Curated annotation (Swiss-Prot):
Keywords: ATP-binding, Cytoplasm, Fatty acid biosynthesis, Fatty acid metabolism, Lipid biosynthesis, Lipid metabolism, Metal-binding, Nucleotide-binding, Transferase, Zinc, Zinc-finger. Zn(2+) binds at C59, C62, C78, C81. GO terms for cellular component: acetyl-CoA carboxylase complex. Pathway: Lipid metabolism; malonyl-CoA biosynthesis; malonyl-CoA from acetyl-CoA: step 1/1. Its cofactor is Zn(2+). InterPro entries: AcCoA_carboxyl_beta, Acetyl_CoA_COase_Trfase_b_su, ClpP/crotonase-like_dom_sf, COA_CT_N, Znf-ACC. This is Acetyl-coenzyme A carboxylase carboxyl transferase subunit beta. Component of the acetyl coenzyme A carboxylase (ACC) complex. Biotin carboxylase (BC) catalyzes the carboxylation of biotin on its carrier protein (BCCP) and then the CO(2) group is transferred by the transcarboxylase to acetyl-CoA to form malonyl-CoA. One of its GO terms (molecular function) is ATP binding.
């Protein structure tokens, strides 16, 4: 005997009207009699709001979360551990020179690509990218300005532009600045922030700048000039091996990395453990390489005092 296995569809019309289904997902179904008719929850007010960019920053040294404006007011120094953050060349100008006194020199000198050097991209393309990203035409700003009403020749390198490396334009700008200081009997202040040394993209042309700038400094010294060199983090390679180490007075910011090859390179090359704090400002002060460690907030005053003391 054949068995009828059909099951009545609960949604089939009866008497011309659809029957409610317990499995129906229709959104217009009437609410259950006993359920309260609640409004839809307001989820907009409960959304987690992200912290806007540029409000907080993390200290590279102690890891503290810092209010960005407070760090800026302290000249980009951590209020917790005194770590000195990177600052750009233009920020250095604002921190050290009297307001509105900086007169840039030789900004028309621009680097070229005489060797048509290429690594991951061409040197010419790299230069254009760095200029757009940093707003600088090369890794050094040079010019004249006032420090506590004392006129000086002033230069600052910027590690953001190809690690602050010294190419032919950096060397030429520095040489012309030193010659101006010699002619006008100005104190010379160079703040170094160069982790790249001589710029490999220009080959021997960049290495020649070490000798050229050093020779200009020799003539400046012979004329009785006062050169104050300020070393910041990092000052390495050909910059440290030439003009940055030739100051009559050599100041350094706290805990700056200063040397020729970096600690990792030395360890990988000769395979020895380096002394604790090797190549830091504190280590170099202890061993007589620098004259004084100067906190960023005191740098302007220390330079002005040194100029007065030396009669410049």
């Amino acid at each position: 005997m054949e068995m009828d296995t059909a099951v009545e569809n609960p949604a089939v019309e009866k008497n011309g009207q659809p029957t409610p289904s317990s499995t129906s997902t229709a959104t217009d179904a009437a609410p259950t009699p006993n359920a309260p008719n609640r409004p839809a929850p307001n989820t907009a007010g409960n959304r987690k709001r992200g912290v806007p960019e540029g409000v907080w920053r993390k200290c590279d040294s102690c890891g503290a979360s810092l209010f960005y404006k407070e760090v800026q007011q302290r000249l980009n120094v951590c209020p917790q551990c005194d770590h000195h953050f990177y600052v750009s060349a233009w920020e250095r100008v604002a921190q050290v020179l009297d307001d509105g006194t900086f007169e840039p020199m030789n900004e028309h000198l621009r680097p070229t690509d005489p060797l048509e050097f290429r690594d991951r991209r061409s040197y010419a393309e790299r230069l254009v990218g760095e200029q757009k990203r940093t707003g600088l035409t090369d890794a050094v700003l040079t010019g004249t300005g006032m420090i506590r009403a004392r006129r000086v020749a002033f230069a600052v390198t910027d590690s953001a532009f190809i690690m602050g490396s010294m190419g032919s334009v950096v060397g030429e700008r520095l040489t012309r600045l030193i010659e101006r200081a010699t002619e006008q009997n100005l104190a010379l202040i160079i703040i170094s922030a160069s982790g790249g040394g001589a710029r490999m993209h220009e080959g021997i042309l960049s290495l020649m700048q070490m000798a050229k700038v050093s020779a200009a400094l020799s003539r400046y010294h012979a004329a009785g000039g006062l050169f104050i060199s300020v070393l910041t983090n990092p000052t390495m390679g050909g910059v440290a091996a030439s003009f940055a180490s030739l100051g009559d007075l050599v100041f350094a910011e706290p805990k700056a990395l200063i040397g020729f090859a970096g600690p990792r390179t030395i360890k990988a090359t000769i395979g020895i453990e380096l002394p604790e704090g090797f190549q830091t400002s504190e280590f170099l002060l202890e061993h007589g390489y620098i004259d004084r460690i100067v906190h960023r907030k005191s740098l302007k005053t220390e330079i002005a005092t040194a100029i007065d003391y030396c009669g410049k």
